[in-house]
């Protein structure tokens, strides 16, 4: 079992569980679920602290609370079909469950399962003074095992894998990476599952970099095939691929296999608007959005919010003057964190543009009719594209990812929520911090699996 929480959840837990008095404290969390054939994932929807003054006992080695404090939490979980997890602190830094913890949980969790009338596993976690989390699953019969991974989608991307997953040697092809970022970061990279949506101009270059940085698994999504017009910017594509109309995902999968660096690839030559594709992306540790479509960006942002996955969106805009000149060249990297601002609230697109893009997808005839009547604004389909510009954007995106898992900048990562680069006017370059939470995306925060999927009827179950 794995667990995901947002950076805001993590900060709230750290503030509550370590108030400065040296005593243990406790909180609970309501969680959505993602149940797949190969894993169970809990995603934190809401953190519910137990007030310090409500606890019966708080010492450096023990905390207890009245059962009445848990009742409203269980009521809410039962009504919404959510899981319940317990999180308490170990101020002394002991990194696993004590005998006292074992006894307390053996008494508490049977009532949790009984109240919620489910046999689906729950979890219990310990937070250490440095903010690290360790935990274990809890089944109805009291058995369980260490959580295989706990991840935090915050300004820094945090991942804690179980001890069994950490013991591995650095292969020869990764030694230069280890010299730059350390053995620990290389081991982390080899355990991550990263989704890349869009495998064309920027996406193919993002994939190339991730594979050569020894990512454990890549989930590639693109419904299109290689055409001759793509050969100027899709790395590893050939004229033979264009003649054969090979799927872009197949071309990149072939290239990664030829590298022989151990990266597993799951490729979908399908549209993002597919439950199977979205389910595969929902259990990724990071998502890269490398597409132009507005409705695709919106859907990926919503998925990232529902399953608490950090999203790095890559954008390129090259405006030609039509006479062989260039008006402006921009590249933009947006790092979108669950529970924070979104591509929508940052103005990457607006609701009118989203509605137009959705209409174009579902009914080209209706789109053309409304466009002709000036009810909607047209969507640009083809833009100028130059591989060197795409490379700069893709490199900035992957560097942003590396900085988030291994902070190396003088300024904190929160400073770089938005990075804009203007090649035609470098003085216009800017970095922006995270903004206010997006009211639209916050509705889906930590919801996990729903019926219909993501609460969208057009996606079905």
Cite the ranges covered by each PLM segment.
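Internal hydrophobic alpha-helix adjacent to the cofactor/substrate pocket in enzyme cavities
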Residues: 391-410
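Glycine-rich adenosine-cofactor-binding loop
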Residues: 182-227
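Conserved beta-strand-loop surface patch within small alpha/beta domains used
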Residues: 1-85, 92-160
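Glycine-rich phosphate-binding loop and adjoining beta1-alpha1-beta2 segment
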Residues: 220-260
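Conserved acidic residues
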Residues: 269-271
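N-terminal charged helix/coil linker that caps or initiates catalytic domains
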Residues: 143-194, 415-416, 437, 454-461
């Amino acid at each position: 079992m794995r667990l995901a929480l947002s950076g805001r959840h993590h900060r709230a837990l750290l503030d509550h569980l370590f108030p400065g008095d040296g005593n243990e404290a406790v909180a609970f969390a309501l969680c959505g679920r993602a149940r797949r054939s190969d894993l169970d994932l809990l995603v934190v929807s809401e953190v519910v602290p137990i007030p310090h003054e409500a606890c019966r006992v708080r010492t450096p080695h023990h905390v207890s609370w009245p059962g009445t404090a848990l009742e409203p939490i269980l009521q809410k979980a039962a009504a919404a079909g959510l899981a319940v997890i317990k999180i308490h602190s170990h101020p002394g830094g002991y990194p696993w469950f004590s005998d006292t913890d074992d006894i307390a949980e053996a008494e508490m969790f049977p009532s949790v399962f009984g109240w919620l009338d489910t046999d689906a596993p729950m979890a219990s976690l310990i937070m250490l003074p440095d903010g690290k989390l360790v935990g274990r699953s809890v089944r109805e019969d009291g058995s369980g095992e260490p959580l295989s991974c706990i991840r935090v989608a915050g300004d820094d991307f945090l991942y804690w894998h179980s001890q069994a997953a950490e013991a591995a040697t650095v292969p020869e092809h990764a030694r230069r990476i280890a010299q730059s970022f350390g053995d620990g970061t290389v081991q982390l990279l080899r355990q991550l599952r990263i989704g890349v949506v869009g495998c064309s101009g920027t996406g193919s270059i993002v994939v190339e970099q991730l594979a050569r940085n020894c990512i454990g698994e890549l989930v590639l999504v693109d419904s299109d095939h290689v055409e001759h017009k793509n050969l100027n910017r899709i790395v590893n594509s050939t004229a033979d691929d264009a003649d054969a109309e090979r799927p872009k995902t197949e071309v990149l999968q072939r290239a990664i296999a030829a590298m022989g660096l151990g990266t597993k690839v799951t490729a979908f030559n399908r549209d993002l608007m597919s439950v199977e594709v979205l389910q595969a992306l929902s259990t990724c540790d990071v998502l890269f959005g490398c597409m132009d479509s507005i409705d695709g960006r919106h859907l990926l942002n919503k998925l990232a919010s529902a399953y608490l996955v950090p999203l790095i969106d890559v954008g390129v805009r090259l405006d030609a003057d039509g006479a062989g000149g260039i008006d402006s060249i921009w590249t933009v990297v947006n790092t979108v964190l669950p529970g924070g601002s979104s591509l929508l609230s940052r103005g990457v697109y607006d609701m009118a543009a989203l509605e137009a893009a959705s209409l174009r997808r579902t009914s080209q005839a209706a789109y053309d009719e409304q466009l002709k009547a000036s009810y909607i604004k047209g969507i640009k389909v083809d833009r100028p594209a130059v591989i060197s510009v795409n490379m700069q954007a893709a490199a900035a995106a992957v560097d942003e990812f590396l900085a988030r898992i291994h902070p190396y900048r003088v300024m904190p990562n929160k400073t770089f929520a938005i990075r804009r680069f203007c090649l035609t006017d470098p003085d216009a370059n800017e970095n922006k911090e995270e903004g206010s939470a997006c009211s639209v995306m916050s509705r889906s925060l930590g919801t996990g699996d729903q019926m219909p999927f993501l609460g969208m009827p057009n996606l079905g179950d």
